[in-house]
Amino acid sequence: LSLEQISQKTELSRYAAQVLLEASLTIGTVLVKDDQYILAKAGWFLLNDEMAQVNMNFNQDVNYKGLFHLEEALLNGRPEGLKELGNWPTIYEGLSDLPGQAQKSWFGFDHFYSDNSFDQALEIVFSHSPRTLLDVGGNTGRWATKCVQYNEKVEVTIMDLPQQLEMMKQKTEKMVGHERIHGHGVNLLDEKVPFPKGFDAIWMSQFLDCFSEKEVISILSRAAQSMSAEGRLYIMETFWDRQKFETAAYCLTQISIYFTAMANGNSKMYHSDDMTRCIQESGLEIEEIYDNLGLGHSIVKCKLK
C-alpha cells in the first residue's frame, strides 16, 4: 500500500502515518519498494505470533508505567511500580482487582508459558499415580483442571490466597471434574502457616520465582514438614541457566525486572544452583530434574532427605 492508502485506511493524518511507517521501516517491520509499503517477516510475526503478542501485551499493560519506578524499587526492596496499577503490598493480592486489560494481559502471559508444559508435566507427575495432590499457588485452577481431567480419581486441593480461590471457583465451576477440585485459603508469606498433610504429591508451578530466597526456604521447609517418605514435591520453573537457547536466558533474566518493580520487590527468575541450595536447606533432596518441557520449563522432583 502507498502512504496515502495507509493514511486513509487507518484514518491517520498523512504525517502520523509517515512517522510510524518510517519508524517501522528502520526497525525492519515493513519494507518499501516503489513507494509501496510491504509487511516484512518481522512485522508479520509481531502481528501473528502468539508469544510476541503475549509478551508485548504484558509489557504494555502491566509493566510499562511501573518500570519508571525501577530504581526506587531496587533501592527500597519493594515493588514501587505497582502503585501504577493499584494499592497492594504485592501484585498477587491485587490480581483479582487489577484493571481489566492489565489483568487480561497478566494472566495471558502467565498461562501461555505454563500451558505449553502441562501435557508433559502430567505424564511426569502421574507416573507415580498420586491420588491426592496439593497445588500450591494454583491461581485460577488451570493445572488442577488438567489433573482431574487426566486422572478420574485424583483429588486436587489448591492452596492460595482466599481471593485467588474465589477466582478459581468461578473459572472451574463448569469444568469436567470440578467437584474434585478443592480450596485451602492461606497467605504463604506468613511463616506460621503450616502446609496441610496427607498429600501424595505437592505441585508448585511458576510459583517459587514469586518469592525471595528466604521466603522460598520457608515455604519449602513447611512443605517438607507436611510430607511423608513416599510423598514427592514437584517444582516447575523456567531456570535461566537451563535454557536451550541464549535468547531464552536473556528474556528470563529481563523478566526479573518485572518482579523487582511490579510484583514484590525481592524475587527473580532463578538460576538452578540457587534453587538447589534452597531445596537442600529445606530438608529436601533432588531426586530427578526434567528439562526442556514446553517453551523452556524444568521440573525438579524432590523427596525428603
Spans of model-derived segments:
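Conserved Class I S-adenosyl-L-methionine-dependent methyltransferase catalytic core
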Residues: A17-R131
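Alpha-helical subdomain
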Residues: L1-T26, L31-V32, S127, L134-K305
